[in-house]
């Protein structure tokens, strides 16, 4: 929703065991889809960041669509679960997404106390960051890299 990308995800997995594989595989598939959709990345903004405030929580995200898949996440979530969702899976999603989208992603909680708010703000920050980084900028001629490829 916050990235304004026109997509719907329907994921089915072995959730009777746990949601780890389903969440990670969803990150992998979305990452691959972004990598494919961006093609040679000509004309994209490439770099972006966003900060999302949600009550007591503040989370920032920054991205470089660099061709190098890596994520750095500092999301200390105070509880192990939000409902039935294992909170550490949020970070696993971001790692898988960044690796397979071939981008560098930083997600950091600057303030927070409510686990639900922290995770929701993180996903919203990443969505807005991806929207901005993927946007075509008419001022960018060709691929936004001195190397000529990303």
Q: Which positions does each model-derived feature cover?
A:
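Structural preference for solvent-exposed beta-strand-turn elements
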Residues: 1-150
């Amino acid at each position: 929703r916050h990235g304004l990308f026109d997509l719907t995800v329907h994921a089915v997995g072995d959730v009777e065991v746990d949601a780890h594989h389903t969440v990670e595989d969803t990150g992998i598939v979305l990452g691959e889809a972004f990598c494919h959709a961006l093609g040679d990345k000509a004309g994209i903004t490439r770099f972006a960041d966003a900060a999302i405030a949600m009550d007591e929580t503040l989370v920032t995200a920054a991205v470089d669509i660099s061709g190098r898949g890596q994520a750095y996440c500092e999301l200390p979530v105070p509880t192990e679960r939000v409902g039935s969702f294992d909170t550490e899976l949020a970070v696993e999603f971001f790692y898988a997404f960044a690796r397979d989208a071939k981008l560098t992603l930083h997600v950091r909680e600057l303030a927070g106390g409510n686990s639900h708010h922290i995770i929701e703000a993180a996903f919203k920050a990443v969505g807005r960051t991806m929207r901005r980084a993927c946007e075509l900028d008419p001022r960018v001629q060709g691929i936004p890299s001195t190397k000529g490829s990303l």
